[in-house]
From Swiss-Prot:
It comes from Drosophila melanogaster (Fruit fly). One of its GO terms (biological process) is defense response to Gram-negative bacterium. Keywords: Repeat, WD repeat. This is WD repeat-containing protein 55 homolog. Residues 12-23, 31-48 have a biased composition (Acidic residues).
Length: 498
C-alpha cells in the first residue's frame, strides 16, 4: 500500500503539522491492522478452511506466524512455479465465479459421480411451430426417405475393376495389389464376405462366368486364375497365359472366355482344356475391350492403336479390320437388337457401326469433350459412358441424345458395371471408392424420334434422378408451384372487391 508522509484534513491542518512523523506512520499501521481483522472475521470457519487460511481460535482471533504480512512479501518469488498445494487449493475451491480456478477434471467428476466419462446425449425436439415449417418438414422427409441404392464402399488399395455376380447380390472388387474383395451389397449396408489373394501383381480385370460358379481374373503377372465361388479354392491356373501383361477378359458362356494383352494378342480359352483354343495377333498395341453379341459367332476387339478388329470364332481367323482412327478406341457396346455397335474413343466421340459392317462407321456423335474410357449398355437403346471428368452420362443410341448425368465422382472413373437386372450401376474412381446408382427410372424412358427438337447444352448438364446433384430448374419450378398455389388462395394477394 502506498502512503503519504503528510496525512491531513481541512479541519485540523494546523494541528497535524506539529505531529511527529513516526507517530503518523504508527497510526496508519494500526488502522490497516483493524481493517484486516474486520475483513477476516466476516468469513466463517469452513470458508477459511476451504481457502487454506488459518483456523480462528475460540475467541475469534486469528493467529499468524511471523511479524506481519510484509514479511511474507520478502520471500515471494514471481518466477517460482506453483506448488502442488496451490493446485489442490484451486481445485477444491467451490462456487467460484468466472475469474475462479475450478479444475475442469473436478467439474467433470462432479457431473458424473459414478466415474463414467459418458456425456449427456443431445436431443432434437420439435415444437408445433417447427413441425409446420416447410424447411424442417423437408429435412425430416429426407431423413426418413429410404435409400434406393447401397452405400459407398471404400478401400485402402486402388480399385482396378469391378463386376456384379449374375445371380446373387455380390460384387467383386479387383485391386492393384492382386487381391479380389467380395462384398454382399444391400441398400442398408455392405458386408465384406471374403478377400481372395489371387495374383502377385495388379489384377486388371475380374469377371464371373455366366452361371456364377467361377471367378476369372487376369493380371499384369501374365496369368489367368479361375476360382471356385463355392469352395473359395483355385479351380484352374493358366500360368504365363500370355507373353505380355493381360489387360482384359470377356466371358462368352459358361465354358468359353477370351483374353487380350498389352501387345495386341487375343486368345480364346475353354475351361475344360489346359491350353488356348486359338491365338491371333493382328494388332500392335493394347487390347482395351473384347465383346460379342448373343450369338457369339464374332469376337470384337478395340485397341489403343485405333483399330476395331473382328474375329470369326468358328473359323479361328480374323473376319475384318476397320480403317485406322487417329484416336484410341477404348470401349464398345451392342444395341438395337444386336444391329448396332457403338465405340467410344479417347476424344470423346461415339462411332456407330452396322452389325457385320465393321470396316468403317456409319454414324458419328461428338459425345462429350473429355475422353470416354468406359461404356455399358443399360437397355437396348440407352448406354452409360464415363471417363476422366468423373461423370457418368446416359446416352440414347440411334438417334443420339444426351439424357443427362447419372452420377459423379470427384476423380476419374476407372471401372463401370451394371447388375443382372439392369437397375443398379456400380462405378469406381481413382479415389479408391465404389458408388452405386439406381437407374430403374430408365425403364420409363420412351423412344426418341429423329426429328424431335432438343437443347443439347441443357441435356449435357441435366441431372437425372440418381445424381447427387440437383437441377437449378427444379428449384425455380418449386417457386412457380408455390406462387401458383398462392394465386389459387382466395385470401392471398390484393382484394378483388370493386
Amino acid at each position: 500500500m502506498h502512503t503519504h508522509n503528510n496525512f491531513k484534513t481541512p479541519s485540523d491542518e494546523d494541528e497535524l503539522d506539529d505531529l511527529d512523523e513516526d507517530m503518523v506512520v504508527g497510526v496508519i499501521a494500526e488502522i490497516e491492522q483493524e481493517v484486516l481483522n474486520e475483513s477476516d472475521s466476516d468469513n466463517d470457519e469452513y470458508d477459511l478452511v476451504d481457502m487454506g487460511a488459518p483456523v480462528p481460535d475460540n475467541d475469534g482471533d486469528i493467529s499468524y506466524e511471523g511479524n506481519d504480512s510484509s514479511s511474507s512479501d520478502d520471500s515471494f518469488d514471481p518466477n517460482a512455479a506453483d506448488s502442488d498445494s496451490d493446485d489442490s487449493m484451486l481445485d477444491e475451491a467451490g462456487g467460484v465465479t468466472a475469474g475462479g480456478a475450478t479444475s475442469a477434471k473436478k467439474r467433470k467428476d462432479d457431473d458424473n459421480p459414478s466415474g463414467s466419462n459418458k456425456q449427456p446425449e443431445a436431443t432434437f425436439d420439435l415444437d408445433e411451430d417447427d413441425e409446420t415449417d416447410e424447411t424442417v418438414r423437408a429435412m425430416i422427409a429426407a431423413i426418413k426417405k429410404p435409400r434406393s441404392s447401397p452405400p459407398e464402399i471404400k478401400l485402402e488399395d486402388f480399385i482396378t475393376d469391378i463386376c456384379f455376380h449374375p445371380d446373387r447380390d455380390i460384387i467383386a472388387l479387383a485391386t492393384i495389389i492382386g487381391d479380389v474383395h467380395l462384398y454382399e451389397y444391400d441398400n442398408e449396408a455392405n458386408k465384406l464376405l471374403r478377400t481372395i489373394e489371387v495374383h502377385s501383381k495388379a489384377c486388371r480385370d475380374v469377371e464371373f462366368t455366366e452361371d456364377g460358379r467361377f471367378l476369372l481374373t487376369c493380371s499384369k503377372d501374365k496369368c489367368v486364375m479361375v476360382t471356385d465361388m463355392e469352395t473359395e479354392k483355385l479351380k484352374k491356373l493358366y500360368e504365363t497365359a500370355h507373353d505380355d501383361a493381360i489387360n482384359t477378359l470377356h466371358v462368352l458362356n459358361e465354358n468359353l472366355f477370351a483374353s487380350g494383352d498389352d501387345a495386341g494378342t487375343v486368345k480364346l480359352w475353354d475351361l475344360r482344356t489346359k491350353n488356348a483354343i486359338f491365338e491371333l495377333k493382328e494388332l500392335e498395341d493394347q487390347i482395351t475391350q473384347l465383346t460379342t453379341n448373343e450369338q457369339s459367332k464374332l469376337l470384337l476387339a478395340t485397341s489403343a492403336d485405333g483399330y476395331l478388329t473382328t474375329f470369326n470364332i468358328s473359323a479361328r481367323k480374323m473376319y475384318v479390320q476397320s480403317e485406322p482412327y487417329e484416336e484410341e478406341l477404348n470401349c464398345m457396346g451392342v444395341y438395337r437388337g444386336d444391329s448396332k455397335l457403338v465405340v467410344g474413343t479417347s476424344k470423346g466421340r461415339l462411332y456407330t457401326y452396322n452389325w457385320g459392317q465393321f470396316g468403317y462407321h456409319c454414324d458419328m456423335y461428338p459425345g462429350i469433350k473429355s475422353p470416354i474410357s468406359l461404356m455399358i449398355p443399360i437397355t437396348d437403346r440407352i448406354a452409360c459412358v464415363a471417363g476422366e471428368d468423373g461423370n457418368i452420362r446416359a446416352c440414347h443410341i440411334a438417334p443420339y441424345r444426351n439424357l443427362g448425368v447419372v452420377g459423379q465422382h470427384n476423380m476419374p472413373i476407372e471401372s463401370l458395371d451394371v447388375n443382372a437386372s439392369g437397375e443398379l450401376i456400380a462405378s469406381s474412381s481413382h479415389n479408391n471408392d465404389v458408388r452405386f446408382w439406381n437407374v430403374k427410372y430408365f425403364e420409363d424412358f420412351g423412344d426418341i424420334k429423329y426429328n424431335e427438337k432438343h437443347n443439347a447444352y441443357k441435356e449435357q448438364r441435366h441431372n437425372l434422378p440418381s445424381s447427387k446433384c440437383s437441377n437449378a430448374s427444379d428449384f425455380f419450378s418449386d417457386l412457380t408451384k408455390e406462387n401458383a398455389d398462392g394465386d389459387d388462395d382466395p385470401g392471398a394477394g390484393p382484394s378483388n372487391m370493386a
